[in-house]
Amino acid sequence: MAKDLKFSEDARQAMLRGVDKLANAVKVTIGPKGRNVVLDKEYVAPLITNDGVTIAKEIELEDPYENMGAKLVQEVANKTNEIAGDGTTTATVLAQAMIQEGLKNVTSGANPVGLREGIDKAVRVAVQALHDISQKVENKNEIAQVGAISAADEEIGKYISEAMDKVGNDGVITIEESNGLDTELEVVEGMQFDRGYQSPYMVTDSDKMIAELERPYILVTDKKISSFQDILPLLEQVVQSSRPILIVADEVEGDALTNIVLNRMRGTFTAVAVKAPGFGDRRKAMLEDLAILTGATVITDDLGLELKDASIDMLGSANKVEVTKDNTTVVDGDGDDNSIDARVSQIKAQIEETDSDFDREKLQERLAKLAGGVAVIKVGAASETELKERKLRIEDALNSTRAAVEEGIVAGGGTALVNIYNKVDEIEAEGDVATGVNIVLKALSAPVRQIAENAGLEGSVIVERLKHADAGVGFNAATNEWVNMLEEGIVDPTKVTRSALQHAASVAAMFLTTEAVVATIPEPDNNDNPGMGGMPGMM
């Protein structure tokens, strides 16, 4: 396939147009008075959202050079979302500001490599300064504030705070769609372990790349399953029941894995295979935990059991199982309550007896998985469109609160980035390196400027006043008042702010040091130039 090339200024300007198109669509959503963006969805109702990464993912531009620029900013949003789970709009605004300012300097003759060095130096100082002003999240109320700010909804903040209170900061919290109008929180018994599906073809939701199984049977074994014939008699019994099955084994490979995937794709039955969690003796113990939770019998040589002789009554079951590429969550297992209580007591006794810190930690993990719960936030709304938008906001808010617990909080609304302005300004540098530092300095005020403009105000005036305000004092765009952001509960997780700045700077530096761009020339559409009629198969 033929390629087209652009060099230096032509290349960068073409990509900049793409950066601006994507960033301009995303940045209208930032702040309490940010707007929504409507995304066209084939075959279903349009999606209305203010989630930066969701908007960024939808944008595909016709011009290949513009599209490459847009994809770079998409990468900023994706990486920030991956690391911190929120802050994607802030990251996009920062990236656009750095790229625009940097490009002006490159066009004026600055050396891009020197600019990159200055950008890197400034970001290192900025990140350290953010950590220096960061405050720990101390209580349930502060967790609720973080969630409320992220979702722009106090009620959502309370639900997330309650969920984290019930299952712990590292507990499993899932978000589901409710059939009613109200959003509810419920905690159900569940277990999560860090093993995902063995093939992506096992997913039931290709958009989210997850497998959701309702009322599945659960096979628990420490054996390696290589031959499909070994599990065929058991699967035939499962097929007759019209229920899905989760297979937890040492490994599913060879023709066993191939046939499971083929039958899943044909719709014969739904089966998801995951590797058993843990290693060695710990793996055996965790499989026994899972078996007790779900009412299964572990198919193991220790009990003299063979897979080909296994019957359906040896399988466990659960109300729901969710499997991602990295994790499996079993919700509401059908195990006997007395057996579960006895197992919990046994693990507690082992924790008391052990002298090893490592063993104690692993036993406590097992106890949490067995005795702990899964908190489910059931999202309600008046329409499907509102439901999807609300669900996205809650997912962002949950990620934000977890990030806040991990690294603390700073003043929100972009205030913290302006508060660290002086620290970055103190960096001693010369020439193009100093120019690189100035690129970051100018970008630090971009989120506040955009939040003010989305509120219908003059961004430059707000930024100038903020630079001279006391630390922590910022502009509340929701009420148009100057307040102490931390006291008012207008906060951002340090991790979110830090990640947004780091990823924006990384992509901006790559953009500025780009000297050539290679794009694929689209092939002409044959329908535009229909050939002469002829016999089938003839040229």
Swiss-Prot record:
Signal peptide span: none
Compartment list: Cytoplasm
Keyword Isomerase: yes
Residues engaged in binding ATP: 29-32, 86-90, 413, 476-478, 492
EC number of the protein: 5.6.1.7
GO biological process, one term: protein refolding
Pfam families recorded: Cpn60_TCP1
Quaternary assembly: Forms a cylinder of 14 subunits composed of two heptameric rings stacked back-to-back. Interacts with the co-chaperonin GroES.
Protein family according to the UniProt entry: Belongs to the chaperonin (HSP60) family.
NCBIfam families cross-referenced by the UniProt entry: GroEL, PRK00013.1, PRK12849.1, PRK12850.1, PRK12851.1
Protein's name in the database: Chaperonin GroEL
Name of the encoding gene: groEL
